[in-house]
């Protein structure tokens, strides 16, 4: 899935890649701060472990984005000197991992609301750590196998049965994760805003809902474009290439937006000066706001 097509070196290629680099640099700083604070400055709990790994996935995805776009711009200036390597497989690992983290966050939060007694009493202590480790391993395995059999969007082996099976399995995984994300998020919304036993809105709910919403608006188009190009065989002409560039910019915006969401939710309605640690801590707060509310982490089980 190379970003270049014959004769495509023009302002339409230059501007999107500059946007990717700019938003990517902002996102790298934001996700690095989130990773540092959650990894070394704050006590970890069930949901902060997922947020930490999501920040790592966003950081790696943006890093690949920046390298890819920078090399493309250098090739734009010196087409005969610099070879543009393919980062598609590497980029898909954090993309799949990020989607998996979001699905896991939303699903676990849904379970804590729908089955609160089971969640508090029967949930294994290290569930978040085990889940995140499994997500990284499976994401890497899926991408390596897909690249081994045919490569992402590589039409060279498109009629090979192993390639078709690998692409089908990868697409099925993405669709499954998307369905899980949507259903669990919908269940959370129903419990928050509908029925007599609706839950009170907390900052943790707001953080999760905004993160999922931004992914659906900005991160999902990249996966949809990949799916259409693989299975429906859309013509990779000017129109499809423009959509592809737009999807790439949106994915960079998605990974860049997550730290902004955390700090926005954590600082909302608090005018006084606070450290980034306190703001991020408040964004993961799982208790309803009160006039005398103090900063506290989620009441979920703490994980080492």
Curated annotation (Swiss-Prot):
Tissues with expression: Expressed in a subset of IB4-positive small diameter nociceptive dorsal root neurons.
Transmembrane segments: 18-38, 47-67, 81-101, 133-153, 168-188, 212-232, 245-265
Subcellular location: Cell membrane
Ranges facing Extracellular side: 1-17, 68-80, 154-167, 233-244
Topology in the lipid bilayer: Multi-pass membrane protein
GO biological processes: G protein-coupled receptor signaling pathway
Alphabetically ordered keywords of this record: Cell membrane, G-protein coupled receptor, Membrane, Receptor, Transducer, Transmembrane, Transmembrane helix
GO MF, one annotated term: G protein-coupled receptor activity
Chief location category: membrane
One GO CC annotation: plasma membrane
Family annotation (InterPro entries): GPCR_Rhodpsn, GPCR_Rhodpsn_7TM, MRGPCRA, MRGPCRFAMILY
Annotated signal sequence range: none
Topology, Cytoplasmic side: 39-46, 102-132, 189-211, 266-304
PANTHER family in the record: MAS-RELATED G-PROTEIN COUPLED RECEPTOR, MAS-RELATED GPR, MEMBER A2A-RELATED
Function, in words: Orphan receptor activated by a subset of RFamide-family neuropeptides such as FLRF-amide and FMRF-amide. Mediates its action by association with G proteins that activate a phosphatidylinositol-calcium second messenger system. Its effect is mediated by G(q) and G(11) proteins. May regulate the function of nociceptive neurons by modulation of pain perception.
Similarity comment: Belongs to the G-protein coupled receptor 1 family. Mas subfamily.
Protein name: Mas-related G-protein coupled receptor member A
Species of provenance: Rattus norvegicus (Rat)
Gene: Mrgpra
